[in-house]
Amino acid sequence: MESKSHIHQKYYVPEQSSIPIIFAFAALLVGFGAANAITGNGTIMLWIGMIAVVGTLAFWWSIITKESQAGLDTPQLNNSYVYGMAWFIFSEVMFFFAFFGALFYIRNIAIPWLGGEGPTAKGLAGELLWPDFEPTWPPMITPEQSLLGENAVTKGPAENMYLHSIRDLGTWLPLWNTIVLLSSSATVHVAHLALKENNRKRFNFWLGITVALAFIFVILQAVEYYEAYAHLGLTLNSGVYGTTFFMLTGFHGMHVLIGGIFLLTQLMRSANYNHFTDKEHFGFEAASWYWHFVDVVWVCPVSYTHLRAHETTDN
């Protein structure tokens, strides 16, 4: 008699596809387009790449969904989806780790050294490289501005985005963004519980609330950027403070937008096609994992770019 350990399960092997290669080229276009769009030369490339990415993913996901609904998935294939999503989220963690590492280095190593701490002396570092340098974060003046004044291209902001400079906490957008995002983490969990109870109506309701909160966050983020540019003078030309601020918050905001679209896709599948059961709902689970990851990551940008400021090094 053949033992249970030797019983082989059927494994569905998809047909060969060029979709991964097309997606890779589309993502490459997005990267080059975004880099060149800063100088005003890559906007068209960026939009072409974004359209190609969205179209490719939509087509790819539709194929996977059809295969799942046709019963072609096996436990082995489902495990490969789980591991694939886990590695994808891990790679995203490494992205954020690199950006936070850069900000940590600037704030905790570079600025104190320029201020006279560490192996470099103030006379060698600060006085030669930047005579008017003040070892505080965020720097409100750029090296070019200290030399050229109003003729400088890169200028520090008139005000910063940190909590201590806010006069009215009720209008402080990062606070509302935090409330919105943490609330959405709770609502997506409630939706998951409803799905496990096979309550589709409640699942659709709470998932819809989560999607709405996701796009509210994106809108509030856009309003905050407008306020930074129009009223605070904080732009990408505001030196290291401007670049790190917009890199971290913008990169996170992009992930919120992607996560919102991901959740919206699951809502449409459930509401329009009655996809998902209390036992089989990995598409939603993957979206919820990604969303919880986005929520947790937000704590770091809001702490470093909105709460902790003006760390002064005494000379």
Give the location of each predicted region:
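Membrane-interfacial helix termini and the short, flexible loops that connect transmembrane helices
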Residues: 1-86, 90-93, 97-171, 175, ...
